[in-house]
Amino acid sequence: MIVNGIGALNLKPGLGDTATDLIQGGVAPATSGNLGTSFAEAVSQAASKTVNTLQNAEQVSLQALKGDADTRQVVDAVMSAQQALQTAVAIRDKVVSAYLEVSRMGI
């Protein structure tokens, strides 16, 4: 599965742009007392949100097996988890690509 760009991940309209939600939603706005979050914190928060989305999909799937959730809830949760995972993979691929590009640079 190759993802050409984060913007291409609009799998389900109405759920919001997961890539934007993961990145922008986890970063606090800079204020005079707060210089903003570091890149590591932003990535950590995005990863945590991705894990939470995947765990939610798993919980909804288990609820459906018990008869406590309908099919629509399962589909929404699984599609959201798929979109979050694809976004995480795309970000990982870009980070690895950037690292390899920097490592090939001449000094």
UniProtKB/Swiss-Prot annotation:
Keywords: Bacterial flagellum. GO terms for molecular function: cytoskeletal motor activity; structural molecule activity. GO terms for cellular component: bacterial-type flagellum basal body. Signal peptide: none annotated. It is found in: Bacterial flagellum basal body. The keyword Lipid biosynthesis does not apply. GO terms for biological process: bacterial-type flagellum-dependent cell motility. Its main location: other. It comes from the Bacteria. InterPro entries: FliE. Belongs to the FliE family. This is Flagellar hook-basal body complex protein FliE. It comes from Mesorhizobium japonicum (strain LMG 29417 / CECT 9101 / MAFF 303099). The lineage of its organism: Bacteria, Pseudomonadati, Pseudomonadota, Alphaproteobacteria, Hyphomicrobiales. The gene is fliE.
